[in-house]
């Protein structure tokens, strides 16, 4: 089970919040800036020592299909984790936004002909890249693959 980096407010949700806590989630308070990053880094190092993978949305949240990374850029937190933990990053593209809209707990599988979310596991990015190169590669690979999955589902 991966340690999921998530906004702290999610741990207060009934049932699922307890699940997040018990599963080793890494809650962060977004408005705490550098302190949130430091805490996230400490918890991420603990997760790595326990041989756990981590999951983070690089834009800090789920993003609706069609919203460009220019409108909702990739945030430095994902690079911070990458640089602090020194482990490979495995980018994952998906088309979940088509059936699970942002700001909604309700899912709409009938919107897709396949009735299911498709994930595409992309080649891992080895540790050690400079920030600009890492973020550029991560963004390009995820955005291209996600757009391809969305286009395929809608065609």
Q: Which sequence ranges carry the predicted segments?
A:
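Membrane-interfacial terminal anchoring regions of lipid-handling membrane enzymes
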Residues: 46-49, 97, 120, 129-155
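A cross-family acyltransferase "interaction/gating" segment
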Residues: 15-17, 49-55, 64-133
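Residues at or immediately preceding the N-termini of alpha-helices
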Residues: 33-34, 131
């Amino acid at each position: 089970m991966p340690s999921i980096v998530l906004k702290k407010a999610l741990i207060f949700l009934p049932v699922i919040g307890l699940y997040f806590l018990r599963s080793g989630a890494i809650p962060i308070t977004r408005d705490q800036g550098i302190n949130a990053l430091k805490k996230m880094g400490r918890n991420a190092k603990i997760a790595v020592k326990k041989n756990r993978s981590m999951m983070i949305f690089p834009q800090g949240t789920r993003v609706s299909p069609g919203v460009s990374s220019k409108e909702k850029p990739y945030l430095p937190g994902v690079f911070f984790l990458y640089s602090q933990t020194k482990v490979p990053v495995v980018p994952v593209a998906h088309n979940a936004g088509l059936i699970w809209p942002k700001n909604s707990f309700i899912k709409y599988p009938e919107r897709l002909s396949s009735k299911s979310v498709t994930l595409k596991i992309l080649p891992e990015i080895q540790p050690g890249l400079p920030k600009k190169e890492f973020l550029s590669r991560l963004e390009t690979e995820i955005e291209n693959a996600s757009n391809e999955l969305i286009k395929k589902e809608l065609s």
